[in-house]
Amino acid sequence: MLAKLTIPDFIVDFIFARWYLGLLVIALYMMGTWLAVRLLPLLPALILSETPPRKAVAKTWRMTRGQTWRTLLAVLLIFIPVAVLTTLLTIGLYLLQSYLDSHWEHWALLGATINLGVLQVVMLLLTVFFTVMLYQLGTSQAETFQLIPNQDLIARVPKRRRNLLFRIGAVGLIALVIGGSSLFYYAYLTGALASQPLTISHRGVDDGNGVQNTIPALQATAKEKPDYVEMDLHETKDHQFVVMHDENLKDLTGVDAKPHQLTLSEMTKLTARENGHTTKVASFDQYLAAAERLHQKLLIEIKTTPEDSPQMMNHFIQLYGQRLLADHDQLHSLDYQVVTTMRKQVPKLKTFFILPYTLVFPETPASGYTLETTTLAMRVIDEAHNRDQKVYAWTVNDSDDMEKVAFMDADGIITDQLGELKTTLYQMNHHPSYADQILQYLTSFSDDAEN
């Protein structure tokens, strides 16, 4: 259960920038581990006895007092050999595939298909072994603590007559599974299951080449020809729109104020500083006009606050709806009301719903979803595609994560490192590493299995 508890990267960065929050998270994880170990016999007790859940919890808690360290050691004695075998197998096959990639290119694809199949089968067996052993440990403890009656672990299986037809059928089924899996692995390794994702510059910058959400940064980044430049806007005190991400201007401008407290004229007189660059804050009119001159499409995030005017969205649509549609721009927002309003009033304008955490797949009228990459899973992308919706991954700044998200078939990748993203995608298309693809497959599908 603890393996399923994932904190998004942007929250992790926020937490560990504040040491006291980091200590709190570590303490919570340790407490969760302690509870999981302490209550290990509870699951067998709930399954194999007729004791009401509340009484089962109370009895388990009482009987396991003083047994936590012994149980933890037993769990580690199961986990460590499995982890070591998995690591050695993965490293061994990775090195073998790397050798094939560099010295036996004609056999590299066949070798990758076989290696991936072997790795999947062995890891599945190890996972089953670990799960069964963990359950047996819990069952044994439940018996010792008299939470359940003693179990007869030796099942009596009646002998069956294995005639020729049965054997042929079994062999045929195995061959079918192996053949189907091999075709799937081949399609995955050759890129047949994935399309080229859109490249999207986060806040209009690439590797700190300017101040986020400003026109000079837009001009510099547009030279690299991203598919979209993502940017943010807020409503101002006089109900206009300014290009700004933060709800407080202090970090960028030194002014301790919020966008809704200043007029647009006051906002655009402020100077923003970041990454060694200095420039003026831009109105959305100025930024949009600059993007049109550059023929650069935008992905516009509409930021909302409780202080926004009731007519904000109607005003925005009246001013920009048809213009954005003509420019082939797109929108996204964390505010569900923004998404539904845009989809209702400007249905042809693609509008995405931003989700910082993906627990279940939502039912929305959005054109697609902007999903935080930490909790992004292939099953979520597949579900979106089945519903004719797109998925953008945000924010992906590491080349390994870029490869992973691309192989998961995300429709777009939002990044602060546009140059690295374009290089990574080029390498994937023109100089593929089957060894790296095997690792990406394992991490992608293990994430799906956990979710």
Residue ranges and their predicted role:
Residues 202, 221, 232, 267, ...:
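Conserved, mostly hydrophobic/aromatic
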Residues 186-238, 250-252, 257-261, 266, ...:
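Membrane-interface segments at or immediately adjacent to transmembrane helices
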Residues 245-349, 385, 441-450:
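Metal-dependent phosphodiesterase/phospholipase catalytic core, i.e.
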Residues 1, 14-52, 108-145:
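Selective recognition of hydrophobic, aromatic-rich stretches within alpha-helical transmembrane segments
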Residues 155-189:
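Internal/C-terminal transmembrane anchor helices
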Residues 354-451:
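C-terminal active-site rim and adjoining tail of enzyme catalytic domains
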Residues 196-200, 228-230, 297-299, 328-331, ...:
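Structural preference for beta-strand elements that scaffold enzyme active sites
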